[in-house]
Amino acid sequence: MSAFEITVTPSRLKQKKRAEGREPAVVVMAPFSAKAIVQFEDVPITKTARRQVRVLNPSDDDIEVKVMKAIREEHNLSLEWMEHTVPARDEVSMELVWSPVLEVACKETLQLIDNRNFRKEVMIILKSKSNQPVKNPRKFPTVGKTLQLKSPTGAGKTMKSVVSAAVQQKKRMSAAAAPPSKQTWRVTAPSRPAAWAHPPPQAPLVEKNVYKTPQEEPVYISPQPRSLKENLSPMTPGNLLDVIDNLRFTPLTETRGKGQATIFPDNLAAWPTPTLKGNVKSCANDMRPRRITPDDLEDQPATNKTFDVKHSETINISLDTLDCSRIDGQPHTPLNKTTTIVHATHTRALACIHEEEGPSPPRTPTKSAIHDLKRDIKLVGSPLRKYSESMKDLSLLSPQTKYAIQGSMPNLNEMKIRSIEQNRYYQEQQIQIKAKDLNSSSSSEASLAGQQEFLFNHSEILAQSSRFNLHEVGRKSVKGSPVKNPHKRRSHELSFSDAPSNESLYRNETVAISPPKKQRVEDTTLPRSAAPANASARSSSAHAWPHAQSKKFKLAQTMSLMKKPATPRKVRDTSIQPSVKLYDSELYMQTCINPDPFAATTTIDPFLASTMYLDEQAVDRHQADFKKWLNALVSIPADLDADLNNKIDVGKLFNEVRNKELVVAPTKEEQSMNYLTKYRLETLRKAAVELFFSEQMRLPCSKVAVYVNKQALRIRSDRNLHLDVVMQRTILELLLCFNPLWLRLGLEVVFGEKIQMQSNRDIVGLSTFILNRLFRNKCEEQRYSKAYTLTEEYAETIKKHSLQKILFLLLFLDQAKQKRIVKHNPCLFVKKSPHKETKDILLRFSSELLANIGDITRELRRLGYVLQHRQTFLDEFDYAFNNLAVDLRDGVRLTRVMEVILLRDDLTRQLRVPAISRLQRIFNVKLALGALGEANFQLGGDIAAQDIVDGHREKTLSLLWQLIYKFRSPKFHAAATVLQKWWRRHWLHVVIQRRIRHKELMRRHRAATVIQAVFRGHQMRKYVKLFKTERTQAAIILQKFTRRYLAQKQLYQSYHSIITIQRWWRAQQLGRQHRQRFVELREAAIFLQRIWRRRLFAKKLLAAAETARLQRSQKQQAAASYIQMQWRSYQLGRIQRQQFLRQRDLIMFVQRRMRSKWSMLEQRKEFQQLKRAAINIQQRWRAKLSMRKCNADYLALRSSVLKVQAYRKATIQMRIDRNHYYSLRKNVICLQQRLRAIMKMREQRENYLRLRNASILVQKRYRMRQQMIQDRNAYLRTRKCIINVQRRWRATLQMRRERKNYLHLQTTTKRIQIKFRAKREMKKQRAEFLQLKKVTLVVQKRRRALLQMRKERQEYLHLREVTIKLQRRFHAQKSMRFMRAKYRGTQAAVSCLQMHWRNHLLRKRERNSFLQLRQAAITLQRRYRARLNMIKQLKSYAQLKQAAITIQTRYRAKKAMQKQVVLYQKQREAIIKVQRRYRGNLEMRKQIEVYQKQRQAVIRLQKWWRSIRDMRLCKAGYRRIRLSSLSIQRKWRATVQARRQREIFLSTIRKVRLMQAFIRATLLMRQQRREFEMKRRAAVVIQRRFRARCAMLKARQDYQLIQSSVILVQRKFRANRSMKQARQEFVQLRTIAVHLQQKFRGKRLMIEQRNCFQLLRCSMPGFQARARGFMARKRFQALMTPEMMDLIRQKRAAKVIQRYWRGYLIRRRQKHQGLLDIRKRIAQLRQEAKAVNSVRCKVQEAVRFLRGRFIASDALAVLSRLDRLSRTVPHLLMWCSEFMSTFCYGIMAQAIRSEVDKQLIERCSRIILNLARYNSTTVNTFQEGGLVTIAQMLLRWCDKDSEIFNTLCTLIWVFAHCPKKRKIIHDYMTNPEAIYMVRETKKLVARKEKMKQNARKPPPMTSGRYKSQKINFTPCSLPSLEPDFGIIRYSPYTFISSVYAFDTILCKLQIDMF
């Protein structure tokens, strides 16, 4: 019987998720706005995506926005516009169109800029994807969810879980699209019959039914066609509504036979309708419960096929279960691309999977889960209850654990099994059985419980063989059926064993179905893999048992389930029956055995005997185990106080680390980081103090202290270490070269106090301690005032203190390192340190600071102060093992491992490090292997050092295995002995218990079989009645719901039709109304347009008439104006032309003068001095001329009255003046001579210095050449000796072995003689050099003393002469002033009436005098500049000459050197060729020896194996005698088979070895070929480079010849040009004089013409304006209307009212007393203003004060004044901004936490902030060295109640807006030292903010200057970036909140502290 069920539930459309990436991005063109981001996510290539960007203008003005930085063209991104105007308070859209041509994923920036120079960046994220299908070789996605059995839940909860799983899957799904050609679900037929079969899984006891005969039934793939599901609604076909309309629910009785054809979903009319009255007779024997019988299990064929499951968001697949208590909410089994197919007897179409827009809404279940459970219990009875109880227990376990515990699994290591792969004894084998009829089953699924017996036996057999790895037993046996595509996975790869745990399975992206239920499987079971199958196989018969309630669930989205159009699926032809396999032949002949090399049964080296059976995964796993063991060996013990000499249990260590994660061996520095525990550090301090007070430290330190106090060792006087920050930094860098742990220990011991540090790598803490304790003396500072720190006495004290402590520290660290007071002995110096010796640190310190010291170590050695430590390569070597293929090849780590194993410490001292060459590595490896040989450890496999160095993998792994096996084999033997004894004692008891359990099991099995048979018969009869009743009720209910649905559908259609008609009618009515209104509006608009156009036309006519009248008058006017304009332009053009020519000549003259002036800039200082002298002379000369002229006028006037008296007085006065003039002239000439003599002296001085330098250079070159010749001779002698030694050595190799010792002795003797002679020659040369050096120093000292004497004498004579001249000049000046005063008194009495006339004449004479003096000055300047030019040319010539001489010398030396290099290269190549040939012969002999050894070893192995075989044969014969004839036959057959297998094995071994030898020879040949090709290419390159160099040298020689010729030509040309230039300057001077005269005359004429022109120009505009105004008013009056006149009158009235109102407001404001006081104050200040009280003078005075010495209180007042000025008038501090910034940073760095220093820091930080905000001073304020100071101040004042922290945060905020400064600040604040400071600062700031919030009282107002900003602004306000000039308007001066300030700068710098 069959039934159907129709469920018509309208699907609820899922609301699509809002695409945030496609929403328009908003770009606000204003500061502090959010950054816009435009996303192009997953855009297919060659497709087009569009995004919108809204540019918003929040300001009140229109702005022009331009695209300043567009996207690169290769991205193919186009913009809608590049420039646009954005209105005020409006926005503009920009469309971005992207058509990707390549697959790209990047981030770009689009930069916008407006007319206010405001920039805004838009981040554009571009991500495209390929639209080509991705070929995924993994056709089966990884199973990602475990099979879990849970208690039933409601259907609503089920649907929620499925929907949520689908949503999560969509988020995680990658974009891997399926090929478009595969659009249907299909079954792929195998290419060949199933060749791999497996043993049948046995069903559990409760499932067996021995009373039923098997029958065949068709079985179909899953998902099954929905039309055959008795408990599910079939998929709705396309003609469903028509079918339902034609249905007639008439009861009828119909049965369907076995051979009835398959019913398709479209043939709905053929479905039978169950009746209530129908009586169907069914035989009890034909009706069987849904259980699995053993017969069906034995005969059912099964094979694995694959089909493609494409994407579908929701796929409804029903599960055929009778148990209604199962709810779909429980976790489902993953569904992959591989499913199980059971061949049916006839074809069956697969149902289509239709695509939905979203998941269907959850349906409310018709019945509760409790009711379903009760009904099932009622129907099935006790077996179902047993099943439910058993499933409760199984549901508590994970599927892996349940499957793993099914077999007999001895857990050797007591470890939890996480996956099936770890179960050595669990295997699942499947065989194909004959297909059976499934009469009553709707689905068949495999059961794992029935396979336990077979799996245990199979695994136990494999585990007993020593050839199999226990870990590999459960991996290779599971084989899936062959598939068509060779790249697809096998079925066992799709099992749950691929996932390591439940968590990982849960995360994978899979589709889940519900778990199998054993009680619902009927007569047959489909085979399954080692875990729950990927998809359950479904089968159905014609008489399937129906179910009253439909059960549906949805599959989550996976990579394999992609969207596709619904198409019918194809089923392969089932006419071909699969073949039956008896056993799995692949199980016993596998390609890879993977033996466990670390098993107890493995006694032969597996890496030399069976590597051909190992796959790469197994080898990689073994290498990982070896790496873990080696890292554990070389690791420093965690307990540093442990005894390092205790023997390490190597075998136990390997077992411990094998199951752990790989931990790389830490270095000594990493281990020292954990050395900060209190006990260990205190112990270390105690040992260090004992060492410091020991006798070997006390004596040298005492002597050094005495020397330092006596100033025998002292710091240079010009080095103030406590004030020189640069020198402090240098010393600090030297000290930080030490390891922080050692440095901390040394500082604590030397200074006698503990250093509080967070860790041993706290560099900031160490630096702070050094700066505060080494470069400062707190005792002295506390004893005296702060001014004492600036005195010389304190400087000497601190120098002694610093020098003494540094010397103590270096000696202590050297001794402590040698004594090894730290047990793990870390390096004394850090690895990146440039110095590796304590002696280097001392020498560097002495060269920087100490005075009058040559070699300080020689001085200190006499005091017992000797530094010996030197850090070697092995001290810094990292022994961690990361790659076995590389790490063991140098031999260093291998030697360290041997030291650890053999408890030795003398091996690493013999190493050759760094091991660069192959010989060094071979030596190191031989050293390690030799140590093993000395310990009586024999290595097998002929492992040589060359194999390890060459990276031979098998021999390297064999070496490690032998080391491990050496220590593990005794434990294996002991454990095996214990197990054997125990097993022999308990074996009899085990056999007896097994027999008892077997009898009891058989008895229970028979009883259970009888009970089951009786119960099943009773239950089946009961179930038939209930089944008939339920089917009838279901049919009635189905009819009722169907009829209701049809009625509802008809009602819905009617209602929908009515609504449609209503909408259409209302739309028609509304359309008519709008049409009528539109017609009326159009007619009105046309009428208005007609009137307006008529008015415009009238206006145009009037304007045309008026224009015609105006044109006639304007033509006449224009003609007259044109004539006047042409004439005037002609006259003016001629004048302008003349002026242009004169100006052009003048400009050309000025250009020439300016070009000549540029050459004078280098001597500007001397010229200024000369200019001042010339001006002084000019002034005196002019005064003299004026006096003489006035005297002449006076005598001329007085001669008319008293001629004689006037003549006499004039004569006397003339004589006096003449004498004065002569004296003045003499003085001037004397000054000129002196000046010229000084210039000549300087010139001679420069010539002498140049000659002296040249002489010194020649001397140096000569001495160097002499030294080079000597060294060359020594080199030739040495080379000759070496060649002789090599020749002798080669000859020695050819001699007999008996003379080897004698020749070696002879060679050694020769070497000693050569060394002795060379040393003797060296001493002789050094003595000569020292003598020459001494003589040279004496000569230089005498010469310098003589020159210094001459210089001092010349300066004295010059000073004496100048003093005499000054005295003479002073007396003459005094006399002249007296006479001049007398003369002026007489002159004033006589010439009072004629003063005006004289003034006029005097003005003319002064003008002429000025012109003459100007001409004289120009002449002097020309002469002076010409002389300077001449001097410069002479210098240039001398330099060129000297450079040419130097180049010639260097060139000749280089040529000689090149010849020697070529000769040396030829000899070296010949030597290398001979050596290579000889080494090749040696290597060939060595290989022959190795081959002979291997051959002998193989022969011995064959003999040994044959003897073993004979022994076994004898033993087998003895056993055959003991056993029966049957045992003899079995053993004989086994022996024959073993012999045959051995022959096959031996032949295989021979073939493999031959193949290995051939492959290795081929690889070696290829390697040699590659080396030869490489060397050949290198030789070709060298030849090419040598030939190119020869050509270059030849070209260079030609070039130098041409260059010398060119220099000669240039010299002649420049001399000629200088002559012409001097001539041209003279001509120009004459031309200029004539031009000036013409200019003056022309200027007078120009003035007259210009006056006339100005009069005409002033009159014409007024006339034109009046005329144009009259005409404009006339036109305006013609256009005026009454409305326009009213509007104009209103505007005028409004302007009058506004004018009166504004005047009233201004007058009212002026009555304000404050404004009046300010005005009075300004007027008073203007009257009292003086130049001394100006702001600039105050700034200069403050800067001078700060440059000198000062005290803190005075500096505070000055800095306060500068703070105010830098904020209000920052431009006045531009000239001193660099000094102010440096000074403020220095004050902040030196300040402490006192109140005065706090105020100093506050003022300094504000000054820097004000200067940083001003654009012209920002560059000088930013200093990279100041970042350290700012960071220290932030850390120091972050938790104090002060404005310093907010001010410095504001300063960083201002700096961070510049990209370059932001990068520098980011780099500094992200280094390891600054990270600590930033974290501490953030923590303290947060604590301060929390304390403020928890405080009961409000915090007091800060005493800052700008405290009012907290009232006006919120705590999250950003400070201004521009200077506010003392007025806070829109932004606060600094940050308000400290927490917000620090978070803001961290965000701006993109620093994440978490």
Curated annotation (Swiss-Prot):
Residues 1614-1641 form a coiled coil. Residues 836-968 form the Calponin-homology (CH) domain. GO terms for cellular component: centrosome; microtubule; microtubule associated complex; microtubule organizing center; nucleus; perinuclear region of cytoplasm; spindle pole. It comes from Drosophila melanogaster (Fruit fly). The keyword Lipid biosynthesis does not apply. Its main location: cytoplasm. Disruption phenotype: RNAi-mediated knockdown has no effect on nuclear positioning in fat body cells. Residues 134-155, 476-548 are annotated as: Disordered. Keywords: Calmodulin-binding, Cell cycle, Cell division, Coiled coil, Cytoplasm, Cytoskeleton, Developmental protein, Differentiation, Microtubule, Mitosis, Nucleus, Oogenesis, Phosphoprotein, Repeat. Required to maintain the structure of the centrosomal microtubule organizing center (MTOC) during mitosis. May have a preferential role in regulating neurogenesis. Required for germ cell mitosis and oocyte differentiation. The modification Phosphothreonine is found at residue 364. This is Protein abnormal spindle. One of its GO terms (biological process) is establishment of mitotic spindle orientation. The gene is asp. Pfam families: ASH (PF15780), IQ (PF00612).
